């Protein structure tokens, strides 16, 4: 009897070891029928408007599956709400890797959240393509498992500052930034360009992502004499800033990152105050007549009729496009190594965003952005086409 009990105990232990993947050796993330892909994003919380990025990626994966998958494998897609909280990001990613056996992540809003998990993903040899944010710590030094599409915030902020000074002829500029890696990366690019012109910012003011009362910060900008204010903040903070300024009679030329370039949404939630705001942009307009954009727009209308087709939602497709392309080029004998090889051989890939180039020595895909202005009713007015940052130091290394 004791021998039978011992045998049963050993059998249970062995089965449990087989069933549960460990943190140090995650499941391969695919089999003959499916490839498991995931994304985190703020479906709730202060950055909830960015949550549509993760939902938008599903359109591309559904199109792939409708066409029979990639080399016979369908994509099984997982989304987790991290509430724009790095602690929640870590918990969600750990659960996905260790319990679901994820092959790769795409997108992923929040620079702080991404920094919290990038090393964990690399240690578990999980690929991450197209973070929905961009800081230099992602790609310098090269992380063999992380491939960035998003222009570096330093590059974008530098180009926007150049536009303000050279095109708008404004020299009194302030910078309003989220007090984290996202906001501080934009601040670095702003300072780089201002130093190039030998100009001094009239004000640099930080804000916490969850702050609701911005009266003191906006009064400081007004009293500084800033004629233009660049903001590197989340959508909720941006709207509070504009509404606060409207009440104190302060109307600078607002400028922001492409993270706030979903004009239809921003125009709506700001009560029309977003009209006239200038932002960076790194995709074609969502109402463009380009065949690929038309294809995605029609697919979204059919597959997700309750979703609003906008830039944030479409960006989810953009971030996933190069990953799908690499899976196709990796061939039917899929492995992490085969996919990495294909990603490192990406040359002038063009979806609905900028051209993307990766190599084993360079995982920053682009530094080009466009500059748009919000027109009446949330329409897009192009001010400047694709432009690379002439001060980008990373390309000279």
Predicted regions and their residues:
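Segments of small-molecule ligand-sensing domains
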Residues: 302-313, 324-382
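Extracellular/periplasmic periplasmic-binding protein-like sensory domains
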Residues: 242-317, 374, 387-394
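Beta-alpha junction/loop-to-helix N-cap segments that form part of ligand/metal-binding clefts
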Residues: 34, 49-56, 67-140, 207-212, ...
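Extracytoplasmic ligand/sensor domains, especially the bilobed periplasmic-binding protein
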Residues: 87, 99-205, 253-278, 285
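Short glycine/serine- and small hydrophobic-enriched flexible loop segments
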Residues: 62, 243, 321-329
């Amino acid at each position: 009897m004791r021998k039978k009990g011992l045998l049963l105990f050993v059998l249970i232990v062995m089965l449990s070891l087989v069933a549960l993947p460990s943190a140090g050796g995650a499941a391969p993330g695919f089999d003959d029928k499916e490839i498991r892909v995931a994304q985190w994003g703020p479906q709730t919380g202060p950055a909830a408007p960015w949550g549509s990025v993760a939902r938008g990626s599903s359109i591309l994966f559904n199109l792939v599956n409708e066409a029979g998958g990639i080399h016979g494998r369908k994509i099984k897609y997982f989304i987790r709400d991290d509430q724009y909280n790095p602690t929640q990001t870590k918990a969600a990613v750990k659960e996905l890797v260790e319990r679901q056996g994820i092959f790769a992540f795409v997108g992923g809003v929040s620079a702080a959240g991404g920094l919290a998990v990038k090393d964990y993903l690399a240690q578990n040899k999980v690929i991450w393509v197209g973070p929905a944010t961009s800081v230099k710590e992602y790609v310098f030094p090269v992380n063999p498992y992380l491939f960035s599409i998003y222009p570096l915030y330093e590059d974008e902020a530098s180009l926007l500052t150049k536009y303000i000074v050279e095109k708008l002829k404004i020299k009194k500029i302030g910078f309003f930034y989220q007090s984290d890696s996202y906001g501080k990366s934009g601040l670095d690019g702003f300072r780089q360009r201002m130093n190039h012109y030998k100009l001094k910012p009239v004000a640099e003011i930080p804000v916490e992502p969850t702050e609701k009362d911005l009266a003191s910060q906006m009064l400081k900008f007004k009293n500084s004499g800033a004629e233009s204010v660049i903001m590197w903040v989340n959508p909720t903070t941006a709207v509070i800033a504009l509404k606060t300024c409207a009440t104190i009679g302060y109307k600078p030329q607002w400028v922001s990152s492409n993270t706030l370039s979903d004009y239809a949404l921003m125009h709506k939630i700001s009560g029309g105050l977003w009209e006239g705001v200038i932002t960076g942009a790194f995709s074609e307009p969502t109402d463009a007549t380009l065949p690929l954009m038309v294809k995605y727009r029609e697919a979204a209308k059919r597959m997700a009729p309750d979703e609003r087709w906008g830039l944030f939602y479409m960006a989810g497709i953009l971030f996933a496009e190069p990953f799908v392309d690499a899976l196709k080029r990796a061939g039917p004998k899929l492995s992490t190594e085969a996919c990495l090889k294909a990603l490192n051989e990406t040359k002038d890939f063009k979806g609905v965003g900028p051209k993307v180039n990766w190599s084993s020595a360079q995982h920053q895909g682009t530094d080009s952005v466009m500059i748009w202005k919000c027109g009446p009713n949330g329409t897009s007015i192009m001010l400047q086409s694709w432009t690379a940052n002439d001060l980008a130091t990373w390309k000279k290394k």
